[in-house]
């Protein structure tokens, strides 16, 4: 039976329906907004035992079918392949608000498949993916404490826009995806153009109002088609095991919790875990993993209690303190820009590389094919946390962290017209104990300034945490990895001294009240200013020039109608320039030209060459030209590529000239002055006036018409008159 609900959201109709598609799944919902349609199906191992993993084994796969935009996939096989970066980020966006809404003891394998089935090329699918996945879980029998709503918030011309279109986002001052329950925000992610804290919080308030409507719509669908929820009865641990582990571990856990550095602490925890598991092996075989979970709970309880009781964290800091910071730039001699940013036991080596137009990344999406001239790649090798990890390409986490840092930095980059370089920033995390993505933001800002990229202002980032018990709470600044793990919130906030450029928040509790968020944002701002002070103490502004090893790029415009003349038949002209100068030349349809190369003199030569090909003759200007043809009445001289003018025999010399060949020959290079461009565009030149700047144009008797066979490129020229 088909069940359907609908409402107005942001001036467009939002509809949800179930009962027609994928009826054998645990829950399936189709969401339509405009002409964009997303379908999500959720399923779980209903009859299998809970997973033995120490985490909730939920996977989300968001895919944008190319047929949704009326396209056929490229490549040899002509079918969808590995998920694109946008799809991976969409999968993470769906996963993050849903994961904390399941009970800890529910560990059955759960899968969410979301598909973009139709795209109107204006409304993006990720938001609908969150809605449809949430609705699918809400109508299923699974113990999901949702539903959740999701909206995108923009700000254009002083007004907030709910679910701005792709076109509107191009001029929007912010782009935030916000998810939550009726009265609490659970997840947010996005970017902004240095907005104030007040504007950010207003956006969250508006988002909350719209989220409530979306949640109520899903609740209406649940009333029509929802199944009764089952109660999770499985225990996490065998009877008596938790008490036995606590008895053996509790005396030492308090000591371990304040042990540093991280590696020493981790080794001590592992040794204790193995020892206790060995002691309990007779009664509880293969129990080491569960022993680790119980010890984890003990350390979490101790960490939180100490913060509430003493306002002291495991590393001795107060809740509002940031860790010691050290940063340096220019440490890699042949790179274009480099920085090492160290905050506590988190360390990022960040390198900026400048490239040319040909280095831009082509992004083939459902909406359109686009090009990216700024890329930030984040790498998290195993050794950064003392582990062994295979190299299989970037993980979803690495892609997500890189995207957050990229969005945060992108807001301060110069426009292409002012700095026509392709920029790639790579952040290699060398050590990690919390907030490596924000260390990447700080390091990227420093590396870009070291590379001479004229960014508007430095950007810094900090991760905020939270511990909350009932009405009691404590906000933590610059959290450690353990505080992220044991705490209730991970709020990453990046920005300049002016305002916020990037934000991401994930909660492990049911939601976050507006008052708490406002306080966390203010604390993050204070920390960000302190970090910027430290960064600017090392390098306060971009270097005056780019690295000597970076390519030189000159950008200028030529008339669109001259593009063909520059390229030449079959690319003949442009190839000649490339071969002679060793440069790269990119010409866009709008007439913009990018000339790049590693040898400045060759770049200048190529620029002058191209400009000369489109230059028009100018009366009064002296040119260095080549004699191309000789007639009985004068000589034709090429003063610009493809542009000839006539030096009449009377203008070859102050003396009387009997034969043109007595003064010039074909192939001679001579200086000539442009004296006239007639109504037909023909150029008249004078060698005599170029040789003698004081010479005046003299009157000559009228001359006879030239023979038609000796004319110009049109095989003839009307009579020359003085």
Which residues does each predicted region cover?
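Extended amphipathic alpha-helical scaffolds
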Residues: 1-45, 51-54, 231-368, 551-565, ...
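Glycine-rich, flexible beta-strand/loop modules in the N-terminal catalytic cores of phosphate-handling
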Residues: 25-111, 116-123, 182, 189, ...
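Conserved phosphate/anionic-ligand binding catalytic regions in large, soluble enzymes, centered on
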Residues: 27-29, 123-141, 329-352, 433-453, ...
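Flexible glycine-/small-residue-rich
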Residues: 33, 42-44, 62-64, 114-118, ...
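Flexible, glycine/charged-enriched surface loops at secondary-structure junctions
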Residues: 104-110, 145-147, 214-232, 264, ...
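Short, hydrophobic beta-strand segments
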Residues: 114, 186-191, 232-236, 247-257, ...
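Mobile "lid/hinge" segments at catalytic clefts and subdomain interfaces of large enzymes
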Residues: 141-260, 448-544
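Single-stranded RNA-binding regions, centering on S1/OB-family and related RNA-binding modules
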Residues: 549-553, 560-722
């Amino acid at each position: 039976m088909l069940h359907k609900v609908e409402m107005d959201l942001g001036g467009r109709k939002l509809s949800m329906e179930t009962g027609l598609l994928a009826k054998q799944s645990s829950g399936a919902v189709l969401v339509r907004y405009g002409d964009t349609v997303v379908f999500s199906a959720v399923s779980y191992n209903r009859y299998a035992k809970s997973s033995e993993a120490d985490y909730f084994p939920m996977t989300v796969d968001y895919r944008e079918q190319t047929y949704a935009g009326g396209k056929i996939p490229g490549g040899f096989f002509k079918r969808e392949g590995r998920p694109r970066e946008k799809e991976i980020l969409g999968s993470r966006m769906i996963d993050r608000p849903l994961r904390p809404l399941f009970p800890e003891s529910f560990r059955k394998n759960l899968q969410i498949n979301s598909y973009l089935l139709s795209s109107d090329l204006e409304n993006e699918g990720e938001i609908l993916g969150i809605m449809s996945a949430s609705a699918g879980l809400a109508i299923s029998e699974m113990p999901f404490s949702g539903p959740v709503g999701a909206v995108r918030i923009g700000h254009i011309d002083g007004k907030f826009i709910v679910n701005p279109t792709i076109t509107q986002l191009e001029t929007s001052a912010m782009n935030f995806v916000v998810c939550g329950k009726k009265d609490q925000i659970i997840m947010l992610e996005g970017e902004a153009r240095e907005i104030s804290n007040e504007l950010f919080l207003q956006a969250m308030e508006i988002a909350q109002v719209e989220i409530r409507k979306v949640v109520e719509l899903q609740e209406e669908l649940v009333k029509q088609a929802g199944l009764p929820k089952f109660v999770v009865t499985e225990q996490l641990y065998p009877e008596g095991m938790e008490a036995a582990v606590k008895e053996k571990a509790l005396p030492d856990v308090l000591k371990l919790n304040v042990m540093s550095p991280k590696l020493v602490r981790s080794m001590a925890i592992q040794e204790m875990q193995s020892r206790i598991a060995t002691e309990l092996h007779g009664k509880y075989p293969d129990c080491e993993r569960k022993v680790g979970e119980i010890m984890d709970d003990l350390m979490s309880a101790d960490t939180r209690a100490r913060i509430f009781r003493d306002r002291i964290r495991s590393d001795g800091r107060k809740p509002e303190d940031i860790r010691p910071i050290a940063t340096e730039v220019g440490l890699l001699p042949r790179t274009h820009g480099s920085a090492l940013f160290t905050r506590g036991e988190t360390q990022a080596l960040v390198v900026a590389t400048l490239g040319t137009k040909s280095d831009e990344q082509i992004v083939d999406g459902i909406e359109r094919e686009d090009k990216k001239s700024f890329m930030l790649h984040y790498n998290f090798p195993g050794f950064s946390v003392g582990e062994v990890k295979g190299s299989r390409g970037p993980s979803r986490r690495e892609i997500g962290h890189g995207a957050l840092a990229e969005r945060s930095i992108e807001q301060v980059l110069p426009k292409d017209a002012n700095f026509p370089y392709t920029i790639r920033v790579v952040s290699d995390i060398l050590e990690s104990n919390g907030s490596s993505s924000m260390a990447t933001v700080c390091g990227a800002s420093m590396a870009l300034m070291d590379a001479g990229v004229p960014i508007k202002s430095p950007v810094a980032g900090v991760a905020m945490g939270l511990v909350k018990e009932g009405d009691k709470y404590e906000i933590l600044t610059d959290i450690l990895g353990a505080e992220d793990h044991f705490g209730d919130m991970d709020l990453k906030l990046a920005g300049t001294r002016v305002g916020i450029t990037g934000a991401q928040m994930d909660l492990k509790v049911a939601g976050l009240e507006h008052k708490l968020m406002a306080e966390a944002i203010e604390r993050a701002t204070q920390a960000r200013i302190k970090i910027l002070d430290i960064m600017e103490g090392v390098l306060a502004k971009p270097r005056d020039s780019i690295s000597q090893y970076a390519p030189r790029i000159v950008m200028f415009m030529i008339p669109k109608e001259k593009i063909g003349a520059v390229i030449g038949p079959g690319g003949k002209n442009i190839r000649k320039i490339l071969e002679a100068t060793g440069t790269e030349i990119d010409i866009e349809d709008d007439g913009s030209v990018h000339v790049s190369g590693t040898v400045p003199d060759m770049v200048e030569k190529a620029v002058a060459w191209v400009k000369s090909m489109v230059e028009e003759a100018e009366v009064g200007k002296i040119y260095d030209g080549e004699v191309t043809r000789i007639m009985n009445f004068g000589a034709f001289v090429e003063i610009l590529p493809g542009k000839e003018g006539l030096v009449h025999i009377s203008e070859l010399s102050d003396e009387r000239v009997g034969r043109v060949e007595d003064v010039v020959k074909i192939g001679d290079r001579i200086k000539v002055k442009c004296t006239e461009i007639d109504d037909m565009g023909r150029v008249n030149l004078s060698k005599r006036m170029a040789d003698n700047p004081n010479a005046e144009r003299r009157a000559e008797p009228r001359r006879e018409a030239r023979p038609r066979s000796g004319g110009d490129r049109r095989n003839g020229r009307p009579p020359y008159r003085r």
